[in-house]
Design a protein with these regions (language model features):
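Extended glycan-interaction surfaces of carbohydrate-active proteins
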Residues: 1-70, 96-149
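Extended amphipathic alpha-helical segments enriched in small hydrophobics
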Residues: 69-104
Length: 149
């Protein structure tokens, strides 16, 4: 999925932002591969939201700034990209992102496995998780508990 003119430069590391072309992708096979990576716990999937860096990358570190934590603004954009193609996958991303935001104390970014808050706590863009919860088919999840695993 991560290829093209930057494959020999900064594009060598598989990152979540490199999957953002899904917002405008018209190749269904390619889109399906991206959605699968977002949910795969060996790729970008996590109980507290999608990882910023693919888990198989040597630089992946779930607690290191842009090396693997969940960033709510990227998770939000991925939900917007996935929703028209796969509502079930989008709902799964919403659930994990909301779980992470809640567990983190609405942090700037958080560990994708534990939801431990990183950076500024609270931070305004974590509020995007509340927007996702409100827009989801389950509403704001009613009385259902939020659990990172």
């Amino acid at each position: 999925v991560d290829a093209g003119p930057t494959a020999d430069g900064s594009g060598r590391v598989r990152t979540l932002d490199a999957l953002l072309p899904l917002l405008v992708e018209d190749d269904e096979r390619r889109a399906d591969r991206v959605v699968a990576q977002l949910l795969d716990p060996t790729a970008h999937g996590g109980p507290a939201g999608p990882t910023g860096v693919h888990r198989a990358e040597p630089v992946f570190d779930p607690d290191a700034y842009w090396r693997g934590p969940v960033w709510p603004q990227l998770a939000y954009l991925m939900v917007q990209a996935v929703a028209p193609r796969s509502p079930g996958a989008a709902e799964a991303l919403v659930r994990t992102t909301v779980a992470g935001a809640w567990a983190s104390g609405m942090a700037e970014y958080w560990n994708p496995d534990t939801g431990a808050g990183l950076g500024a706590i609270p931070q305004s863009w974590a509020g995007l998780a509340l927007v996702l919860a409100r827009q989801s088919t389950g509403g704001a999840f009613g009385d259902q508990p939020v659990d990172c695993g």
